[in-house]
From Swiss-Prot:
The protein's name in its UniProt record: Cytochrome P450 1A2
Reactions this protein catalyses: an organic molecule + reduced [NADPH--hemoprotein reductase] + O2 = an alcohol + oxidized [NADPH--hemoprotein reductase] + H2O + H(+); 17beta-estradiol + reduced [NADPH--hemoprotein reductase] + O2 = 2-hydroxy-17beta-estradiol + oxidized [NADPH--hemoprotein reductase] + H2O + H(+); 17beta-estradiol + reduced [NADPH--hemoprotein reductase] + O2 = 4-hydroxy-17beta-estradiol + oxidized [NADPH--hemoprotein reductase] + H2O + H(+); estrone + reduced [NADPH--hemoprotein reductase] + O2 = 2-hydroxyestrone + oxidized [NADPH--hemoprotein reductase] + H2O + H(+)
Superkingdom field: Eukaryota
Topological type in the membrane: Peripheral membrane protein
Task of the protein: A cytochrome P450 monooxygenase involved in the metabolism of various endogenous substrates, including fatty acids, steroid hormones and vitamins. Mechanistically, uses molecular oxygen inserting one oxygen atom into a substrate, and reducing the second into a water molecule, with two electrons provided by NADPH via cytochrome P450 reductase (NADPH--hemoprotein reductase). Catalyzes the hydroxylation of carbon-hydrogen bonds. Exhibits high catalytic activity for the formation of hydroxyestrogens from estrone (E1) and 17beta-estradiol (E2), namely 2-hydroxy E1 and E2.
Organism taxonomic ancestry: Eukaryota, Metazoa, Chordata, Craniata, Vertebrata
Family: Belongs to the cytochrome P450 family.
Subcellular location: Endoplasmic reticulum membrane; Microsome membrane
Residues at which heme binds: C458
Length: 516
């Protein structure tokens, strides 16, 4: 029987298909950057034509790329569609790139999803990395520090952050008690969202923040729409056709960003109209004053849109990471009650029940600090930094990386590297304590990657660590968290810019004592 009976193509069709394939192959080969003599491109696994490695990445790119790094090394290359992406793993390699060669890797790729955030003017997501961007970053960092971790002369609290967190933590305890008196159980996530958003809102807008706004709470409770789309490897950034096909996730992302930007514009405008220009009480007021100084006597209008963009970045730096960290912490505490008891014993011994915890107590509460660090490491809920890009042709560990190459930083791999941690799958806060168990092992704690490194390091890192500590200290001093017997907690993370655990509606809180 003739072979042609089993082949559904004619010889002409086969010849034409082969010719087209060869042409496409040579075109793509010609598009590859020429590697300077003596260097080489990063190793790359086999990939599908047109699709690249998108199928290999699957629903958990951090796990897939960690597995690839075990075979191909700390510097490897993948393709998402036709776009080359360099993936960095290994703590030393990432430090080399982002710190020692920070100027080479400080860029951001010009991705479609980034253009939808603050109309493409976000300091965190914008591809700009020049002097103007650096000045904006310094301004945002200084404003955030001034009205968060700097001392507050008008308050008995050590700083603005301590004042706001103490207030909202007590309010949170009150809400949880009401829920226990009613349904007798609760989903902690929405309650945490409300508390954290009020803290960052107070620091950004002071008395002008509409903390009871239904729109604000609705936005924050739906922030998962943002983190699910503004993440490393979003197909819409690499396959342009997906922007024009029916795409409900993309439409929700667009709508969320438009709603949030509109809310910020309205709040900033109201703040500008009503605030006392001679009395700066919050971050937005400080930004207004800075812009007035820059405009001088020229009479130029205050660039409110730039202020909105900066406030958007500051708000983001002080909200989602903190909310996610506290939520993960509570899930670990209810699944590991023995750890919760150790923390509460430390709190009872160091602070007692005569006063509330303060930020100045951090050095005397090493086990609580170790628990927070282990939560950061084990959950690795920020699996990748926001993607970087190279600002010029460069080399890393002997591999050539061309200018404007997209770069993924695999923080999850570092936090689960057996060479660093020995038993990375185990949740063990004691790993971060010294041999005597009375202090933190600071060199080891600095090996956790969660906030990035170098010139793009998160401006809210210090704020985040301090806020998580104080919220947990106040909550655990007064409350004991648990779930009823038989309730299973699902700690499997859902991939995103920040990874969330499955929601649990069966958490309970027992009052240990009250200051009332």
């Amino acid at each position: 029987m003739a072979l042609s009976q089993f082949v559904p193509f004619s010889a002409t069709e086969l010849l034409l298909t082969s010719t087209v394939f060869c042409l496409v192959f040579w075109v793509f080969k010609g598009l590859r950057p020429r590697v300077p003599k003596g260097l080489k491109s990063p190793p790359e696994p086999w990939r599908w034509p047109l699709l690249g490695h998108v199928l290999t990445l699957g629903k958990n790119p951090h796990l897939a790329l960690t597995k690839m790094s075990q075979r191909y090394g700390d510097v490897l290359q993948i393709h998402i569609g036709s776009t080359p992406v360099v993936v960095l793993s290994g703590l030393d390699t990432i430090r080399q790139a982002l710190v020692r060669q920070g100027d080479d890797f400080k860029g951001r790729p010009d991705l479609y999803s980034f253009t939808l955030i603050t109309d493409g003017q976000s300091m965190s997501f914008s591809p700009d990395s020049g002097p103007v961007w650096a000045a904006r970053r310094r301004l945002a960092q200084n404003a955030l520090n001034t009205f968060s971790i700097a001392s507050d002369p008008a308050s008995s609290s050590s700083c603005y952050l301590e004042e706001h967190v103490s207030k909202e933590a007590e309010a949170l305890i009150g809400r949880l008690q009401e829920l226990m008196a009613g349904p007798g159980r609760f989903d902690p996530y929405n309650q945490i969202v409300e508390s954290v958003v009020k803290v960052i809102g107070a620091m950004c807008f002071g008395q002008h923040f509409p903390e009871s706004s239904d729109e604000m709470l609705s936005l924050m409770k739906n922030s998962h729409v943002f983190v699910e789309n503004a993440t490393s490897g979003n197909p819409v950034d690499f396959f342009p056709i997906l922007r024009y096909l029916p795409n409900p996730a993309l439409q929700r992302f667009k709508a969320f960003n438009q709603r949030f930007l509109r809310f910020l514009r309205e709040t900033v405008q109201e703040h500008y109209q009503d605030s006392d220009k001679n009395s700066v009480q919050d971050i937005t007021g400080a930004l207004f004053k800075h812009c007035e100084k820059r405009s001088g006597a020229s009479g130029d209008l205050i660039p409110q849109e730039k202020i909105v963009n900066l406030v958007n970045d500051i708000f983001g730096a002080g909200f989602d990471t903190i909310t996610t960290a506290i939520s993960w912490s509570l899930m670990y505490l209810v699944t590991k009650p023995e750890i919760q008891r150790k923390i509460q014993k430390e709190l009872d011994t160091v602070i007692g029940r005569g006063r509330r915890p303060r930020l100045s107590d951090r050095p005397q509460l090493p086990y609580l600090e170790a628990f927070i660090l282990e939560t950061f490491r084990h959950s690795s809920f920020v699996p990748f930094t926001i993607p970087h890009s190279t600002t010029r042709d460069t080399t890393l560990k002997g591999f050539y990386i061309p200018k404007e190459c997209c770069v993924f930083i695999n923080q999850w791999q570092v936090n689960h590297d057996p060479q660093l941690w020995g038993d990375p799958s185990e949740f063990r806060p004691e790993r971060f304590l010294t041999a005597k168990g009375t202090a933190l092992n600071k060199p080891l704690s600095e090996k956790i990657l969660l906030f990035g490194l170098g010139k793009r390091r998160c401006i809210g890192e210090v704020l985040g660590k301090w806020e998580v500590f104080l919220f947990l200290a106040i909550l655990l001093q007064q409350l004991e968290f648990s779930v009823p017997p038989g309730v299973q907690i699902d700690l499997t993370p859902t991939y995103g810019l920040t990874m969330k655990h499955a929601r649990c509606e069966h958490v309970q809180a027992r009052l240990r004592f009250s200051f009332q």
